[in-house]
């Protein structure tokens, strides 16, 4: 793992296409473990952050590889199980094919998308410091009983 510096805001513009979004740069086990602890400790808080981003309204996709056999604690709500199992995460537009690179609308759309993703970026960026690991580990053990 490269550490928490792997959380990014990204925009790419190339002759072959363009894209933008937020997420982790490759697999970051330490940060994702911390996010998993946060999901267990405060599922409503994590859900609220995700809802604040209006991913569907902004036509954003959540991507990333997942652990196939990771045991998800019984208390994790169904709508967060996919997030819990992620090895890495990135959120980007469904499609940018119809966006004209020379259009003033591009700047507006990228700005709006980054503003909408801000709560999720801050959740990922602050995952390590959000909850003391000792407290969360106790909660996880309690849920497994």
Regions found by a protein language model. Give the residues of each.
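Charged, low-complexity intrinsically disordered regions
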Residues: 13-145
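Short beta-strand element of the conserved SAM-dependent methyltransferase core
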Residues: 1-2, 91
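Short, small-residue-biased leader/transition segments that mark boundaries at the very start
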Residues: 3-8
């Amino acid at each position: 793992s490269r550490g928490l510096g792997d959380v990014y805001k990204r925009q790419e513009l190339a002759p072959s296409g363009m894209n933008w979004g937020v997420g982790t740069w490759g697999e970051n086990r330490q940060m994702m473990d911390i996010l998993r602890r946060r999901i267990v400790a405060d599922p409503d808080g994590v859900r609220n952050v995700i809802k604040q981003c209006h991913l569907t309204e902004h036509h954003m996709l959540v991507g990333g590889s997942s652990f196939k056999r990771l045991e998800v604690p019984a208390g994790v709500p169904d709508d967060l199980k996919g997030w819990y199992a992620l090895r890495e995460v990135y959120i980007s537009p469904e499609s940018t094919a119809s966006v004209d690179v020379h259009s003033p609308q591009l700047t507006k759309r990228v700005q709006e998308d980054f503003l909408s993703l801000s709560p999720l970026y801050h959740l990922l960026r602050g995952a390590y410091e959000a909850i003391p690991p000792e407290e969360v580990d106790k909660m996880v053990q309690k849920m497994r009983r």
